[in-house]
């Protein structure tokens, strides 16, 4: 549907105006759903817990009973919170448990030799990118898309989902912008510094500023529907 129209901020508002009642109903349901699950997630996974979690509290591959962060975000209780991150292989999380070999493996599906050191860096990288993102500190070298040494810089679905969860209010929306980069560039162009994360935040700011009657907490659902 979208490729038949000229995508723009003005077109989005025109589309919203024509479908206002239906969109507001959907957005209200989505907002309530996200608010409830977000509160539960934050009780279970306060940001500081990322630094102290064990490897089995992180990895996917050990089954539902493990209640790991990666399982909960992709397949478990929080799979539909803000945005889904399913698809691809378990290696997208950096470290995962391989049932066939009974080994922890990295994103290249290789067995990890220095496991403690490797997992320590992963935890630190995940914590730092979320901590800086929720402060909107996009000038930080972490967010230099070409030079960043943070291993989560390219994992935009997971990072966007966590930014939506850990920020107060609704300064981000639940869409993995990199999956439709050209589409979202019609709103705000993506830059190397800040990448999809700054772009996501700027889109919310732009739409909210241009059309103040659109509540940021409901915008995520509306923008997602518009992008279909």
Q: What label would you give each PLM region?
A:
Residues 154, 159-162:
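Conserved beta-strand->loop/alpha-helix structural units within folded catalytic cores of enzymes
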């Amino acid at each position: 549907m979208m490729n038949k129209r000229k995508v723009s901020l003005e077109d989005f508002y025109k589309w919203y105006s024509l479908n206002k009642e239906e969109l507001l109903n959907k957005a209200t349901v989505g907002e309530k759903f996200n608010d409830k699950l977000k509160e539960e997630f934050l009780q279970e996974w306060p940001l500081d817990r990322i630094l102290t979690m064990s490897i089995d509290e992180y990895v996917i591959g050990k089954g539902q009973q493990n209640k790991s962060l990666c399982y909960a975000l992709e397949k478990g209780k929080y799979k539909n919170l803000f945005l889904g991150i399913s698809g691809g292989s378990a290696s997208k999380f950096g470290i995962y448990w391989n049932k066939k070999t009974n080994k922890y493996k990295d994103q290249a599906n290789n067995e990890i030799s220095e496991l403690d050191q490797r997992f320590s860096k992963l935890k630190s990288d995940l914590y730092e990118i979320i901590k800086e993102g929720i402060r909107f500190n996009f000038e930080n070298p972490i967010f230099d898309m070409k030079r960043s040494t943070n291993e989560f810089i390219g994992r935009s679905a997971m990072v966007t989902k966590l930014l939506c969860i850990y920020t107060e209010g609704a300064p981000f929306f639940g869409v993995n912008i990199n999956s439709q980069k050209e589409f979202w560039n019609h709103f705000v162009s993506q830059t190397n510094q800040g990448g999809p994360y700054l772009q996501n935040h700027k889109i919310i700011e732009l739409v909210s500023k241009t059309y103040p009657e659109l509540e940021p907490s409901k915008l995520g659902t509306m923008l997602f529907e518009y992008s279909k």
